[in-house]
Each structure stands twice: as structure tokens, then as C-alpha cells.
């Protein structure tokens, strides 16, 4: 309580009736004019925690929450509540009070649907005091928000890429090929999941403020309309910032977001051809950078940002056709922790060659490499085999026109990729020897590694024929071994008889 004597000094004796009357009037004015916190129509509602009372609008506050339910808490939690929430006048009661059902002074009719919604949102006054501790509520909200992070629009890697034609689908899936092909042609999609965290905004003021903080940890926009209508806080410090397929948004529209990169670990502009992340977003904490389909990212930009993100682990630069060996060489120099690199493209593949990829292979901790459509040669495969072969897990070589049997077939024959699980070799027209690829698949299956080899329709047909030929050879050898084992006794008797005759002949010569 405020010290009224200090705020309003008075020379009137305290024992006089005039003094008591003036003090009562001043105390009433303080209560009537005390500033209220700004609240929305639903945040100022039933059972919202309050730290003050204000005249007639809050005269329906119930008595302070009892501490009788603290017995089930640990001593540390009980001490935390008591030190923060106890009232100086009543040590056995909590300071925080709850509103009884709110009745508006407005005489205008209220929608029955709104009344029903408010009734559903009602919370019992006897709620456990543990839900008033911000630290515990924050842990609960992070647990609830775990599913909410799945709503971030990302491109999920398919189990295998869709077939290129009906015949290709039948080669891969057999009798189910026609159904798979029809599913590939369809455009059906599932409805996006609803966010659980948004329901937590409607609990009370404490939950509302903490939920806003959790929601600000992951900023993502999958439409231009949502981005234009976003009202950011004064400064947002998210862990992830994702823009997904924004075609109309301009670069100047991003200046109003006020992103603080102090916590930023994931930065993604997926198919946003006109947008370029600001340089201040790149810090040593950034681990994932995804910029596919950009028409503004070039070598100069990569050379500027590469020294700023030494801890980068995931880099996706697919279809960035203005990037050449110069930009990728800077990435290989300043980002040694990269495990996943995808710089595949459909056009201008000659701009990315062995000069930059070999430098990245030598300096980075690669586990996944995608160079589809690039002008790499067989030398890159040998470099991968001897430097990163023991840890490589995924390799995409689609449409690499310079690759031959001297690279893929020879390296696989030597078993230099013991952990490789995904190999993409679509549209490699210069491949002739496919037996090493089939043997590689069987070798990985014996290691209990589920291997996936993605090939085009022509290569898939040849691989299936090679698999049948190899299976026939294996079955023939098995049959020969069984026959030899069954006839092994007769053969052993013949050998022993021949050895005996030779021994007798030698003895006769000696005699």
C-alpha cells in the first residue's frame, strides 16, 4: 500500500474528523484513477490474475487464493511461491487474486456465441498455485509448442522421388505402379495442422504473455498476405525465420520486421526469388541456411556472408543459377562444419565444377552432397571416396553429364562408401557397367542398411535386368555347391584309392 501521508502531506491533526474525511476522499480518488493495464476483449475476462483493484469495475474480485493446496509441492517450489506471491497483510494467503465471472457495464446485447465461448474458457478459482509460477508455465508452453513447430512450412524429403512415367512406376513398384502413378499426378494435399499454442493465449495474462514469447521463437510466413498483416513486437529474437514461396513481397517489406539475430539458428527463404536476407541476420550461431530458387544470390553475396557463419551445418543453394565456383570456394574456406550441401541446378551447370567441389570435400565435414546438374567429373568421386567415404550417407549425381564408369562403377566396386544409403543417378547416359551398383545394393543390405538407388526409366530397366542376371548366377553357384556336397563322399573315396595305388607303386619301386 502506498504511504498516503508522504504522497499528500497534511498539517491537519490526525485525530480531527476533517483529517479523516480528507484522507478517505484522497484514498478513494487514488483507487478510482489508478491506471489500468491495457487488455484485449478476451484477456480481460474470467479468472484473469490481477495485481491491483480499481473501483467498481473490479469490486467483484474474490478473496485471495488460499495456500492450502501448497502441501503437495516440494519445499523449493513452495518457498518460491511464498517469496513471490504472499501478501504482507495475510502471510497465509497469495497476493494474486482472480476475477469472478465478469459482467460488462455495457447495456448492448451480447452475442450468445461469445457468452458460450467465455463460459468454456472459465477456470476454477481453485486452480493449483503451481500454474502461477512463470518458470513452470514456460516449460509447459515449450512442451505444448513442440508440435506447433511442425507447422513451419518446410520441404520434407520424400522416401523416394516420384516416378517419371507410368512404365517407370511399374518398374519400381510392380503391381502397385499404376496406383502410385495416379497418386503422383493428383494434387491432393492434407489440411495444415492447427496450432496448440494459440489456445494457451486465452488462459490468463501470465499464460498470454509467456505464450507470445514462445510463439516469437519461430517466425514463418507461407503467404504474402500473412507477412503484410504481421504486427511485430518492438524487437523479435526468433530461433528460426522462414519465408515460404513469397512471390509478391519486395525487399523493402522485410525492413519492418526488426529481427534480432542473437538467437537465430535457422534462416530459410524457400523459393522467394526477389528476396535477399539482410547481412545482419548472419551470425556465428546460424546453423541452417536455405535459399533455393533465388535469383538474387550470387558469388559476391556468398563471399560476404561466408566469414559470418563459421558454424554453418546445412546449406541449400539449389537452383541458384548465379552462383559459380568462386562463391562455393568461399563457402569451403570459411564454413568447415558443413555436413549437408546441395548446389544442384537445372541450367548453367558448367559454372560449378571440380574446382570448388573438391575444395569443399577437402575442408568440410560432408555427410550429404548434392551436385545434380553440375559439371563435376569422375575425379570428385575418387576424392569423396578417399576423404569422406567412411561418413558419406547421401549422394545426388543426377544429370552430371561428365560422369562415367571410371567414377561411379569403379568406386562402388572398391566398397569405399560403407554408410551410403541414398544414391541418385538419374539421366547418367554414359553409364554402361551396372553390375557394381547391383552388388553395392546387396552389400549394403547385408550390413542392414536400407539403401535406395534412384534411377531414370532407362537405367531402372537395365538395373532390374542386371539384378535378375546376378540372382541367376548366385542360384546356379548355390546349386553347384549343394551338388558337390551331396557327392562329396564318392569323390573322397576315389581320391583315397588313387593315393593308395600311388603309395603301393612307390614301395614296389623301392623294393
UniProtKB/Swiss-Prot annotation:
Pfam families: LRR_6. Keywords: Cell cycle, Cell division, Cytoplasm, Mitosis, Nucleus. Residues 17-34 have a biased composition (Basic and acidic residues). One of its GO terms (cellular component) is cytoplasm. The keyword Zinc does not apply. GO terms for biological process: cell division; SCF-dependent proteasomal ubiquitin-dependent protein catabolic process. Signal peptide: none annotated. Residues 1-34 are annotated as: Disordered. It comes from the Eukaryota. It is found in: Cytoplasm; Nucleus. Negative regulator of the mitotic exit network (MEN), required for multiple cell cycle checkpoints. Required for daughter cell separation and chromosome stability. Involved in copper sensitivity. Belongs to the AMN1 family. This is Antagonist of mitotic exit network protein 1. It comes from Ogataea parapolymorpha (strain ATCC 26012 / BCRC 20466 / JCM 22074 / NRRL Y-7560 / DL-1) (Yeast). The lineage of its organism: Eukaryota, Fungi, Dikarya, Ascomycota, Saccharomycotina.
